[in-house]
Amino acid sequence: MTDSHYIGRFAPSPSGELHFGSLIAALGSYLQARAQRGIWRVRIEDIDPPREVPGAAATILRQLEHYGLHWDGEVLWQSQRHEAYCEALAWLHEQGLSYYCTCPRSRIQRLGGIYDGHCRTLCHGPENAAVRIKQQHPVMHFHDALRGDIQADPQLASEDFIIHRRDGLFAYNLAVVVDDHFQGVTEIVRGADLIEPTVRQLSLYKQFGWRAPGYVHLPLALNEQGAKLSKQNHAPALATGDPRPVLVQALRFLGQRDVVAWQEMSVEELLRFAVAHWRLTAVPTSANVNPAFSNASR
Protein backbone atom coordinates (compact mmCIF):
# COMPACT_ATOMS: atom_id res chain seq x y z
CA MET A 1 0.00 0.00 0.00
CA THR A 2 1.16 3.54 -0.74
CA ASP A 3 -0.19 6.77 0.68
CA SER A 4 2.04 9.41 -0.89
CA HIS A 5 2.40 10.98 -4.30
CA TYR A 6 6.05 9.93 -4.54
CA ILE A 7 6.96 7.91 -7.62
CA GLY A 8 10.50 6.66 -8.14
CA ARG A 9 12.01 4.28 -10.65
CA PHE A 10 14.94 2.09 -11.63
CA ALA A 11 15.68 2.04 -15.36
CA PRO A 12 18.48 -0.34 -16.38
CA SER A 13 19.59 -1.01 -19.93
CA PRO A 14 19.78 -4.70 -20.95
CA SER A 15 23.45 -4.54 -21.93
CA GLY A 16 24.36 -7.16 -19.36
CA GLU A 17 23.49 -8.49 -15.92
CA LEU A 18 23.26 -6.27 -12.84
CA HIS A 19 26.47 -5.82 -10.84
CA PHE A 20 27.21 -4.23 -7.46
CA GLY A 21 27.13 -0.72 -8.92
CA SER A 22 23.72 -1.43 -10.45
CA LEU A 23 22.51 -2.70 -7.08
CA ILE A 24 23.52 0.58 -5.43
CA ALA A 25 21.30 2.51 -7.85
CA ALA A 26 18.43 0.02 -7.58
CA LEU A 27 18.56 -0.23 -3.79
CA GLY A 28 18.98 3.50 -3.26
CA SER A 29 16.01 4.35 -5.46
CA TYR A 30 13.94 1.57 -3.88
CA LEU A 31 14.64 2.71 -0.31
CA GLN A 32 14.04 6.37 -1.11
CA ALA A 33 10.62 5.48 -2.55
CA ARG A 34 9.58 2.97 0.12
CA ALA A 35 10.70 5.23 2.99
CA GLN A 36 8.14 7.75 1.72
CA ARG A 37 5.50 5.07 1.23
CA GLY A 38 5.70 5.79 -2.47
CA ILE A 39 5.62 3.84 -5.70
CA TRP A 40 8.74 2.25 -7.19
CA ARG A 41 8.64 1.43 -10.89
CA VAL A 42 10.99 -0.51 -13.16
CA ARG A 43 11.65 0.41 -16.78
CA ILE A 44 13.83 -1.51 -19.22
CA GLU A 45 15.67 0.94 -21.48
CA ASP A 46 15.99 -1.27 -24.55
CA ILE A 47 16.16 1.33 -27.31
CA ASP A 48 19.72 0.63 -28.45
CA PRO A 49 19.71 -2.90 -29.95
CA PRO A 50 23.44 -2.96 -30.87
CA ARG A 51 24.32 -2.64 -27.16
CA GLU A 52 21.80 -5.17 -25.87
CA VAL A 53 22.70 -8.66 -24.72
CA PRO A 54 20.11 -11.36 -25.56
CA GLY A 55 18.31 -12.49 -22.42
CA ALA A 56 19.78 -9.72 -20.24
CA ALA A 57 16.44 -8.00 -19.59
CA ALA A 58 14.84 -11.17 -18.21
CA THR A 59 17.94 -11.80 -16.10
CA ILE A 60 17.82 -8.27 -14.67
CA LEU A 61 14.22 -8.72 -13.59
CA ARG A 62 15.05 -12.06 -11.96
CA GLN A 63 17.99 -10.46 -10.16
CA LEU A 64 15.80 -7.69 -8.75
CA GLU A 65 13.30 -10.24 -7.48
CA HIS A 66 16.09 -12.40 -6.02
CA TYR A 67 17.32 -9.38 -4.03
CA GLY A 68 13.81 -8.63 -2.78
CA LEU A 69 13.39 -5.46 -4.84
CA HIS A 70 9.81 -5.91 -6.00
CA TRP A 71 8.40 -3.16 -8.19
CA ASP A 72 4.90 -1.71 -8.52
CA GLY A 73 2.80 -2.15 -11.64
CA GLU A 74 3.99 -3.49 -14.96
CA VAL A 75 7.50 -3.14 -16.31
CA LEU A 76 7.71 -0.44 -19.00
CA TRP A 77 9.74 -1.40 -22.07
CA GLN A 78 11.19 1.43 -24.12
CA SER A 79 11.16 -0.78 -27.22
CA GLN A 80 7.35 -0.57 -27.05
CA ARG A 81 7.31 3.23 -26.77
CA HIS A 82 8.40 4.26 -30.26
CA GLU A 83 5.04 5.86 -31.06
CA ALA A 84 5.34 8.12 -28.01
CA TYR A 85 8.85 9.18 -28.99
CA CYS A 86 7.72 9.88 -32.57
CA GLU A 87 4.89 12.05 -31.25
CA ALA A 88 7.35 13.99 -29.08
CA LEU A 89 9.69 14.49 -32.04
CA ALA A 90 6.82 15.63 -34.25
CA TRP A 91 5.63 18.14 -31.66
CA LEU A 92 9.09 19.64 -31.27
CA HIS A 93 9.40 19.91 -35.07
CA GLU A 94 5.99 21.58 -35.38
CA GLN A 95 6.96 24.11 -32.72
CA GLY A 96 10.21 24.93 -34.49
CA LEU A 97 12.20 23.54 -31.58
CA SER A 98 14.29 21.02 -33.51
CA TYR A 99 16.16 20.72 -36.80
CA TYR A 100 17.93 18.20 -39.01
CA CYS A 101 21.70 17.99 -38.85
CA THR A 102 23.98 16.28 -41.36
CA CYS A 103 27.30 17.13 -39.69
CA PRO A 104 29.57 14.09 -39.44
CA ARG A 105 30.98 13.05 -36.09
CA SER A 106 34.48 13.89 -37.30
CA ARG A 107 33.53 17.55 -37.70
CA ILE A 108 32.20 17.75 -34.15
CA GLN A 109 35.32 16.06 -32.84
CA ARG A 110 37.40 18.75 -34.55
CA LEU A 111 35.32 21.32 -32.68
CA GLY A 112 36.28 19.74 -29.37
CA GLY A 113 33.14 17.64 -28.98
CA ILE A 114 30.62 20.48 -28.53
CA TYR A 115 28.35 21.15 -31.51
CA ASP A 116 28.37 24.72 -32.85
CA GLY A 117 24.86 24.87 -34.32
CA HIS A 118 26.12 24.75 -37.92
CA CYS A 119 22.88 23.28 -39.33
CA ARG A 120 20.53 25.36 -37.18
CA THR A 121 19.69 27.87 -39.92
CA LEU A 122 19.98 25.46 -42.84
CA CYS A 123 17.04 23.60 -44.36
CA HIS A 124 18.12 19.99 -44.40
CA GLY A 125 15.57 17.23 -44.87
CA PRO A 126 15.43 14.02 -42.84
CA GLU A 127 17.51 11.94 -45.25
CA ASN A 128 20.77 10.78 -43.64
CA ALA A 129 20.32 13.32 -40.86
CA ALA A 130 20.12 13.39 -37.09
CA VAL A 131 17.61 15.57 -35.26
CA ARG A 132 18.91 18.15 -32.80
CA ILE A 133 17.02 20.16 -30.22
CA LYS A 134 17.03 23.90 -30.92
CA GLN A 135 18.13 24.88 -27.44
CA GLN A 136 15.82 27.57 -26.08
CA HIS A 137 16.05 26.88 -22.35
CA PRO A 138 19.62 26.02 -21.32
CA VAL A 139 19.82 24.89 -17.69
CA MET A 140 22.99 26.14 -16.03
CA HIS A 141 22.47 24.56 -12.63
CA PHE A 142 20.06 22.31 -10.75
CA HIS A 143 19.38 21.15 -7.21
CA ASP A 144 20.33 17.65 -6.16
CA ALA A 145 18.66 16.48 -2.93
CA LEU A 146 21.93 14.84 -1.84
CA ARG A 147 24.59 17.12 -3.33
CA GLY A 148 22.96 20.53 -3.26
CA ASP A 149 23.34 22.98 -6.14
CA ILE A 150 25.20 21.53 -9.12
CA GLN A 151 26.66 23.87 -11.74
CA ALA A 152 26.68 22.79 -15.38
CA ASP A 153 29.34 23.28 -18.01
CA PRO A 154 27.93 26.32 -19.90
CA GLN A 155 28.95 24.95 -23.30
CA LEU A 156 27.35 21.57 -22.61
CA ALA A 157 24.18 23.18 -21.24
CA SER A 158 23.79 25.45 -24.27
CA GLU A 159 24.49 22.81 -26.93
CA ASP A 160 21.88 21.75 -29.48
CA PHE A 161 22.12 18.06 -28.59
CA ILE A 162 20.87 15.09 -30.61
CA ILE A 163 17.41 13.72 -29.82
CA HIS A 164 17.10 11.32 -32.78
CA ARG A 165 20.14 9.62 -34.21
CA ARG A 166 21.15 9.41 -37.84
CA ASP A 167 20.79 5.60 -37.68
CA GLY A 168 17.12 5.97 -36.73
CA LEU A 169 17.46 5.25 -33.02
CA PHE A 170 15.97 7.57 -30.42
CA ALA A 171 18.48 9.36 -28.21
CA TYR A 172 18.61 8.49 -24.52
CA ASN A 173 17.82 12.02 -23.34
CA LEU A 174 14.58 12.21 -25.31
CA ALA A 175 13.36 8.73 -24.37
CA VAL A 176 14.10 9.09 -20.67
CA VAL A 177 12.27 12.42 -20.40
CA VAL A 178 9.22 11.22 -22.34
CA ASP A 179 9.01 8.06 -20.23
CA ASP A 180 9.62 9.68 -16.84
CA HIS A 181 6.86 12.16 -17.64
CA PHE A 182 4.55 9.37 -18.84
CA GLN A 183 5.16 7.36 -15.66
CA GLY A 184 4.64 10.36 -13.40
CA VAL A 185 8.08 10.04 -11.82
CA THR A 186 8.52 12.67 -9.09
CA GLU A 187 12.14 11.97 -8.17
CA ILE A 188 14.96 10.23 -10.02
CA VAL A 189 17.55 8.44 -7.88
CA ARG A 190 20.47 7.17 -9.95
CA GLY A 191 24.26 7.06 -10.16
CA ALA A 192 26.51 10.11 -10.22
CA ASP A 193 27.70 9.17 -13.72
CA LEU A 194 24.41 10.63 -14.96
CA ILE A 195 24.86 14.08 -13.43
CA GLU A 196 26.11 15.56 -16.71
CA PRO A 197 23.07 14.70 -18.90
CA THR A 198 20.67 15.97 -16.21
CA VAL A 199 20.84 19.56 -17.48
CA ARG A 200 19.95 18.39 -20.98
CA GLN A 201 16.99 16.46 -19.65
CA LEU A 202 15.83 19.44 -17.59
CA SER A 203 16.01 21.63 -20.69
CA LEU A 204 13.77 19.16 -22.51
CA TYR A 205 11.21 19.38 -19.70
CA LYS A 206 11.19 23.13 -20.28
CA GLN A 207 10.86 22.71 -24.04
CA PHE A 208 7.84 20.45 -23.55
CA GLY A 209 6.37 22.60 -20.78
CA TRP A 210 6.34 19.67 -18.35
CA ARG A 211 7.03 19.71 -14.64
CA ALA A 212 10.47 18.24 -13.96
CA PRO A 213 11.17 15.64 -11.26
CA GLY A 214 13.67 16.04 -8.44
CA TYR A 215 17.08 14.40 -8.65
CA VAL A 216 19.40 12.41 -6.38
CA HIS A 217 22.75 11.18 -7.68
CA LEU A 218 24.26 8.39 -5.62
CA PRO A 219 28.00 7.69 -5.24
CA LEU A 220 29.59 5.36 -7.76
CA ALA A 221 31.11 2.01 -6.87
CA LEU A 222 34.65 1.70 -8.25
CA ASN A 223 36.90 -1.23 -9.02
CA GLU A 224 40.41 -1.56 -7.59
CA GLN A 225 41.79 0.50 -10.48
CA GLY A 226 39.50 3.40 -9.59
CA ALA A 227 37.20 2.95 -12.60
CA LYS A 228 33.43 2.86 -12.30
CA LEU A 229 31.96 -0.62 -12.03
CA SER A 230 30.17 -1.13 -15.32
CA LYS A 231 29.19 -3.76 -17.82
CA GLN A 232 31.69 -2.24 -20.24
CA ASN A 233 34.64 -2.95 -17.94
CA HIS A 234 33.35 -6.44 -17.14
CA ALA A 235 32.15 -5.87 -13.58
CA PRO A 236 31.14 -9.24 -12.10
CA ALA A 237 27.43 -10.00 -12.03
CA LEU A 238 25.61 -10.01 -8.71
CA ALA A 239 25.95 -13.25 -6.77
CA THR A 240 23.16 -15.73 -7.33
CA GLY A 241 23.40 -17.21 -3.82
CA ASP A 242 22.27 -15.65 -0.55
CA PRO A 243 21.48 -12.00 -1.35
CA ARG A 244 21.61 -10.81 2.26
CA PRO A 245 25.38 -10.27 2.64
CA VAL A 246 25.45 -8.32 -0.61
CA LEU A 247 22.53 -6.18 0.54
CA VAL A 248 24.33 -5.51 3.82
CA GLN A 249 27.42 -4.39 1.91
CA ALA A 250 25.29 -2.16 -0.30
CA LEU A 251 23.67 -0.55 2.75
CA ARG A 252 27.11 0.10 4.24
CA PHE A 253 28.25 1.58 0.94
CA LEU A 254 25.26 3.94 1.14
CA GLY A 255 26.25 5.00 4.66
CA GLN A 256 23.24 3.42 6.32
CA ARG A 257 22.88 2.01 9.82
CA ASP A 258 24.45 -1.41 10.36
CA VAL A 259 21.96 -4.24 10.37
CA VAL A 260 22.58 -6.16 13.60
CA ALA A 261 22.07 -9.92 13.38
CA TRP A 262 21.12 -9.78 9.72
CA GLN A 263 21.91 -13.50 9.49
CA GLU A 264 18.73 -14.13 11.46
CA MET A 265 16.58 -12.06 9.12
CA SER A 266 14.89 -12.95 5.88
CA VAL A 267 15.53 -10.77 2.83
CA GLU A 268 12.14 -9.16 3.36
CA GLU A 269 12.89 -8.40 7.03
CA LEU A 270 16.29 -6.96 6.15
CA LEU A 271 14.75 -4.64 3.57
CA ARG A 272 11.98 -3.58 5.97
CA PHE A 273 14.68 -2.65 8.48
CA ALA A 274 16.55 -0.73 5.78
CA VAL A 275 13.41 1.18 4.76
CA ALA A 276 12.58 2.06 8.37
CA HIS A 277 16.09 3.42 9.00
CA TRP A 278 16.79 4.97 5.58
CA ARG A 279 18.54 8.35 5.77
CA LEU A 280 19.40 10.08 2.53
CA THR A 281 21.54 12.57 4.46
CA ALA A 282 23.84 9.71 5.53
CA VAL A 283 24.69 8.74 1.95
CA PRO A 284 28.24 9.79 1.01
CA THR A 285 28.76 11.90 -2.09
CA SER A 286 32.18 10.56 -3.09
CA ALA A 287 32.76 7.41 -5.13
CA ASN A 288 34.26 4.44 -3.33
CA VAL A 289 35.85 1.09 -4.08
CA ASN A 290 33.45 -1.82 -4.19
CA PRO A 291 33.76 -3.63 -0.83
CA ALA A 292 34.64 -7.33 -0.80
CA PHE A 293 31.45 -9.28 -0.34
CA SER A 294 33.26 -11.73 1.87
CA ASN A 295 33.54 -9.04 4.55
CA ALA A 296 29.79 -8.68 4.94
CA SER A 297 29.70 -10.75 8.10
CA ARG A 298 32.18 -8.57 9.98
From Swiss-Prot:
Keyword Metal-binding among record annotations: yes
Residues the entry annotates as binding Zn(2+): C101, C103, Y115, C119
Binding note for cofactor: Binds 1 zinc ion per subunit.
Keyword check for Ligase: yes
Motif ('KMSKS' region): 228-232
Record: residues binding ATP: K231
GO molecular function, one term: zinc ion binding
Enzyme Commission numbers on file: 6.1.1.-
PANTHER family, A to Z: GLUTAMATE--TRNA LIGASE, GLUTAMYL-Q TRNA(ASP) SYNTHETASE
Protein family membership: Belongs to the class-I aminoacyl-tRNA synthetase family. GluQ subfamily.
UniProt-recorded name of the protein: Glutamyl-Q tRNA(Asp) synthetase
Biological source species: Salmonella choleraesuis (strain SC-B67)
Taxonomic placement: Bacteria, Pseudomonadati, Pseudomonadota, Gammaproteobacteria, Enterobacterales
